[in-house]
Amino acid sequence: MIPIAAITFASFFMGLGGAFTNSDTIKGLHLSGIINEQTGIIYVFQILKAAGEVVFKYLPLFFCLSASFGLAKKEQGFAALSGAMGYLAFHVVISQILKIQGLTADSTAVDFLKENGMSNINAYRFNSLFTTELGIFTYKMSIFGGLFVGIITSQIHNKFYNTKLPPIMAFFSGTRIVPIITLSIMSVLGAIMAFVWKPIGYSITD
């Protein structure tokens, strides 16, 4: 899959960038006169490191796009777009339900939990269930969440991308209806996952 190929280069960029932005490594290799802020070369390695980190930071989304695109029979671009929309809807719904339950980035922070009587181990354990995806506070599902949304989106796309609607609704025929259906289904699945993921997340982290 595309993300797996990207991981190879991302790892290379992170390794190279990380090594040559580390002051101990630079001094150990006697490259302080070359790799520094004056020559600007250190900035090149900082950029390489940042480029590699992007892939790992957004890996679940890339898996979602890859699954949506790769498993679609036709009109793969529309499938990938639907996957992205579905992924966002999925996590936004989870985030809103968590917020209703009083769970936010602040209220699940380790220090806050410890201040409110939770033990150190349980605080870290509970905190590990959550993350922020594209600025959305949600459950930490890693690449499973991306694949889950991507695979379902591809199945929705394959079933409905060639749908013909009555003339009065013809504008929404074909590929245009796929994002609408995807948003609806992923919103429902997001609501369900908001209530069932906690024990699953604990089983993974434990």
Label the model's feature ranges.
Residues 194-206:
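Aromatic-rich transmembrane-lumenal/periplasmic boundary elements in polytopic membrane proteins
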Residues 155, 176, 195-196:
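A short, ordered amphipathic alpha-helix with a cationic face
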